[in-house]
Regions:
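Intrinsic structural disorder
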Residues: 1, 151-155, 177
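Contiguous, non-catalytic segments that form substrate-binding/exosite surfaces or channel walls
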Residues: 1-138, 144, 148
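A generic secondary-structure signal for well-formed alpha-helical elements
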Residues: 52-55, 161, 165
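Active-site recognition of the HExxH zinc-binding catalytic motif
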Residues: 150-164
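Post-HEXXH active-site segment of zinc metalloproteases
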Residues: 163-177
Length: 177
């Protein structure tokens, strides 16, 4: 389902915490779609083939036909299990490579969590200490949050949705690395 305004995930979903990648941890999220921000991710998804074709990657690792990338930005209303109290800023399902290859992927950016992390980082002194000059600092303060949101969208929509493994390569060969 890619059209619902309210959605949820509830169950044993992610296997990152298991070194063998076999047991998943339980997580739950109830959310609603951020319509305006979702338009931004839809533009990226609609152009996924262009990004794939023009990426600076050996052609053996490029998908000939990118398909089924759906993307949205959500506002998390409730988090539980492995998603609480600290959650990721994005979700990409399914985890199975063969399902992704056959049907595509569902990319989600959790907008209110990204916004909260960005706000928490403001005023902590890091930028004042390490940014080279006032002009650069002004640009970071003006555009930094928007750039961070776009970076997350690019990662979720195109990073997880791009590329392919060579024939015979086990998708779990790197385990938790």
């Amino acid at each position: 389902d890619t059209e619902s305004r309210v959605d949820f995930t509830n169950g044993f979903t992610e296997s990152y915490g298991d070194p063998l990648g076999m047991k998943a941890s339980w997580e739950s999220i109830v959310n609603f779609k951020d319509i305006a921000a979702t338009e931004r991710t839809k533009k990226l998804s609609a152009n996924a083939q262009w990004f794939e074709d023009n990426s600076p990657v050996d052609g053996r690792f490029k998908k000939e036909k990118v398909k089924g990338i759906s993307a949205k930005v959500i506002t998390a209303a409730i988090l539980g299990g492995d998603l609480y109290p600290s959650t990721a800023i994005g979700i990409n399902l399914p985890n199975s490579n063969w399902v992704r290859k056959e049907y595509g992927s569902k990319s989600v950016t959790i907008g209110n969590i990204t916004d909260a992390y960005n706000k928490a980082a403001h005023g902590n002194g890091f930028l004042n200490e390490y940014v080279i000059d006032k002009s650069t600092l002004d640009n970071i303060n003006k555009y930094g949050d928007a750039c961070d949101e776009l970076h997350t969208d690019l990662h979720e929509c195109l990073g997880h949705g791009s590329g392919k493994l060579l024939p015979g390569v086990d998708p779990d060969s790197l385990k938790a690395y």
